[in-house]
């Protein structure tokens, strides 16, 4: 299936381009209190090494805002401030931050929005209109309830507000906690504007539930060419958010990066400790950013066939096995030696590609 992405306007968050032909960026949000400068920077650095492109932080009051200024000066990643209720915090943070997210449901009057727009325009930073089904403006929830219709009305109303103020550095999110409603919201808004979309399922839950919901919603939208930046929301799992997001991009065929591991589900034919092997391989290869297909198979039934399509593969047998690279057997070893040799071949494959580039 040919992937064709919806062409959107391009904006910039720090040094990261969003929309247009730019790669789809991956975001996360800290769960520290922003006034905890050391703790916040520690989480930002973890996200940086995990492969995040952009980080968002909550700002509840001026103590957070002042801390955010110091955090921004030391951050390796662009930062977005997440504002609810108090528009003055957005105005203050616009002086040094890379982007502002406002919630139309609680930011207040048109005058409040006008002040935020003025501050962001002066700095040349974008605003995300973050529509959330749980906090729709009363004028729309009274008329439409808390469903997709109300979200669409809110989005279009706030887009027009910003456009009437001659502001167009906009991105939009349409988040619900339900995968189907999230898909519907983004699909229905897409023909109505050409601003970049930030994809996400809000309040998606813990690792298991979030992975399922986000894979369904975000994967579905990405395959339809919808989405310019994304977050996999996950309760308390910073690095996993990035890992799952990158996996969704890779397995949907939208953006190749990192290791794609092919491994069998195991059955009665297995005569080796495949589960231990795959855990080691997964842990030892998670740092790799180069697109790489590797195969770890437990018996000969499908192992050789899978190996033909893999860059590096293991085919386990009884107490021994094969290490295969680009379809060619490079070693036949006893089981205790297989994983180490396999990982050495993986690292050599990565290095050889770097030399060619």
UniProtKB/Swiss-Prot annotation:
Cofactor entry: [4Fe-4S] cluster
MF terms (GO), sorted A to Z: 4 iron, 4 sulfur cluster binding; 4-hydroxy-3-methylbut-2-en-1-yl diphosphate synthase activity (ferredoxin); 4-hydroxy-3-methylbut-2-enyl-diphosphate synthase activity (flavodoxin); iron ion binding
Protein's name according to its UniProt entry: 4-hydroxy-3-methylbut-2-en-1-yl diphosphate synthase (flavodoxin)
Cofactor note: Binds 1 [4Fe-4S] cluster.
Organism annotation: Campylobacter jejuni subsp. jejuni serotype O:23/36 (strain 81-176)
EC number: 1.17.7.3
Binding site for [4Fe-4S] cluster: 264, 267, 299, 306
Family: Belongs to the IspG family.
Gene coding for it: ispG
Catalytic activity: (2E)-4-hydroxy-3-methylbut-2-enyl diphosphate + oxidized [flavodoxin] + H2O + 2 H(+) = 2-C-methyl-D-erythritol 2,4-cyclic diphosphate + reduced [flavodoxin]
Entry-linked InterPro entries: Dihydropteroate_synth-like_sf (IPR011005), IspG_bac (IPR016425), IspG_bac-typ (IPR004588), NO2/SO3_Rdtase_4Fe4S_sf (IPR045854)
